Amino acid sequence: MIGRLRGVLIEKQAPEVLIDVNGVGYELQMPLTSFYELPEVNQPTTVYTHFVVREDAQLLYGFITKQERSLFRLLIKANGVGPKLALTILSGMTASEFVGCVERDDIVTLVKLPGVGKKTAERLLVEMRDKLKSLMEASVGSEREFVLQSNYSPAPTVNSAEEDAISALISLGYKPPQASKAVSAAYKEGMDSETLIKAALKSML
């Protein structure tokens, strides 16, 4: 099982990245909360991973912190939640924000995420409350907090910022018209694609 990768970031196009580890390129999918923490291309990076084996594919999911990976693993154990939906949830809010939703029984915020209907949100609140309690009791220090410290610095602006942002939102489950509208409303001159994605997601929650 692959639990961690340390190498050079070769490509990043939300939500996918390619990391070179001793000449071997590993493709990963990452929630946007972790994606924002990545360094620039051609810089060294370390990510914690979760490896999924299916009949038709072998998939790697990457996370900047162990805490976020732990939450991802709890989410995919919940009834009706697979890796794709778990990735979408953690792209729409940080781990600490999700924990806050569970603690407050905040179903309104959860149903705004693509793929999360009222029944799914209600089930998540019930199932995750006990799972998170058990995890917190077993953790110590910073692992109890589920707080993601951000050192993200926006990359230089690119001409295709809006197109990249729309594509990223669609890949997370948003419908094309919804993604396009959110990106257009959030866009400000000089924005790079990653900042634009974050702003568009925030406007929809």
Curated annotation (Swiss-Prot):
GO terms for molecular function: ATP binding; four-way junction DNA binding; four-way junction helicase activity. Residues 157-205 are annotated as: Domain III. The keyword Lipoprotein does not apply. Coiled coil: none annotated. Homotetramer. Forms an RuvA(8)-RuvB(12)-Holliday junction (HJ) complex. HJ DNA is sandwiched between 2 RuvA tetramers; dsDNA enters through RuvA and exits via RuvB. An RuvB hexamer assembles on each DNA strand where it exits the tetramer. Each RuvB hexamer is contacted by two RuvA subunits (via domain III) on 2 adjacent RuvB subunits; this complex drives branch migration. In the full resolvosome a probable DNA-RuvA(4)-RuvB(12)-RuvC(2) complex forms which resolves the HJ. Belongs to the RuvA family. This is Holliday junction branch migration complex subunit RuvA.
